[in-house]
């Protein structure tokens, strides 16, 4: 449909919220004013009483420093730590509960079809290695960040299973809306729900 071929994908790992106030459970995000990406996530948090504000990455540091926002959905714990976001904001969610983004590499199909078999094989092998490397690297960096942040006095909130289920159930409403956007979206969401139910996390 779009003339693109998927080469491969990888999961960078769970993201962690940055916060200037305690967020130990789902009830605590009521009126939580934070930076959020547009779309589905903003819908879910709004349904739970939070006040997501859509803003660019570049605006987040100043917004946090000036108190314009209470917190931010920015990136992984390690990336947030490396950016210095916990020097002033002493609370975070970890392990994350709300987002596990997936990145991918796609190629123009016409260009892909012109490649020789060994060239395609090399790219497919490289992207698989890249994916495994990124995932393990993020896990290691997050573990290092946990130690450093704990030493800094940052509180890491690990939501209970009950609170995680409350959040996921709230997400179902947004998912139903997004299913209407396209047959592909509906199929993807149903696959996701089936996986979560099979693994006892929904």
Name what the model sees in each region.
Residues 1-202:
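N-terminal secretory/targeting leader peptides
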């Amino acid at each position: 449909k779009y003339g693109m071929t998927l080469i491969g994908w990888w999961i960078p790992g769970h993201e962690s919220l940055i916060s200037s106030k305690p967020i130990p459970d789902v009830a605590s995000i009521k009126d939580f004013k934070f930076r959020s990406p547009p779309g589905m996530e903003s819908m879910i948090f709004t349904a739970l009483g939070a006040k997501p504000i859509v803003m660019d990455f570049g605006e987040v540091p100043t917004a946090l420093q000036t108190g314009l926002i209470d917190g931010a959905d920015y990136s992984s714990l390690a990336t947030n730590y490396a950016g210095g976001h916990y020097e002033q904001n002493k609370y975070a969610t970890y392990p994350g509960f709300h987002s596990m983004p997936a990145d991918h590499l796609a190629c123009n199909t016409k260009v892909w079809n012109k490649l020789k078999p060994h060239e395609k094989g090399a790219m497919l092998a490289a992207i698989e290695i890249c994916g495994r490397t990124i995932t393990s690297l993020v896990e290691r960096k997050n573990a290092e960040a946990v130690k450093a942040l704990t030493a800094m006095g940052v509180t890491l909130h690990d939501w209970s299973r009950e609170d995680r289920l409350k959040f996921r159930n709230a997400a179902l409403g947004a998912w139903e809306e997004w299913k209407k956007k396209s047959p592909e979206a509906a199929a993807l969401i149903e696959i996701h729900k089936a996986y979560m139910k099979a693994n006892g996390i929904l």
